[in-house]
């Protein structure tokens, strides 16, 4: 019996020179997503997915490692210039931006897009430890 031969087309990676880096830094984790201008994700990494667990996920070093991993994957698409959108109150905000700069990505602008309520929902009660 003859084997059926399948011709598979290789997926062509598109070249994107300008991108947007979305950095979401919470108190527990840091998520770095690099998208094109339309918002289609090119690469992403988290500090939890980078091998950090527990309280080490929320450290600036974990955010730096996550940003470096996301930048390495984005460089395969030919990304050179990056606008940075930073969201959240976490400790990994600055170190993630610095890590993108070190990876030969030219940071063109840094914008803080943290949502602030105009006295909306009631916040959770304070912790008593």
UniProtKB/Swiss-Prot annotation:
GO cellular component, one term: ribosome
Cited PROSITE patterns: RIBOSOMAL_S11 (PS00054)
GO terms of molecular function: rRNA binding; structural constituent of ribosome
Transmembrane segments: none
Residues of the signal peptide: none
Keywords from the UniProt entry: Ribonucleoprotein, Ribosomal protein, RNA-binding, rRNA-binding
Key word Isomerase present: no
Domain of life: Bacteria
Pfam families on file: Ribosomal_S11
A single GO BP: translation
Function: Located on the platform of the 30S subunit, it bridges several disparate RNA helices of the 16S rRNA. Forms part of the Shine-Dalgarno cleft in the 70S ribosome.
Quaternary structure annotation from Swiss-Prot or TrEMBL: Part of the 30S ribosomal subunit. Interacts with proteins S7 and S18. Binds to IF-3.
Similarity comment: Belongs to the universal ribosomal protein uS11 family.
HAMAP family: Ribosomal_uS11
PANTHER family hit by this protein: 40S RIBOSOMAL PROTEIN S14/30S RIBOSOMAL PROTEIN S11 (PTHR11759)
Name of this protein: Small ribosomal subunit protein uS11
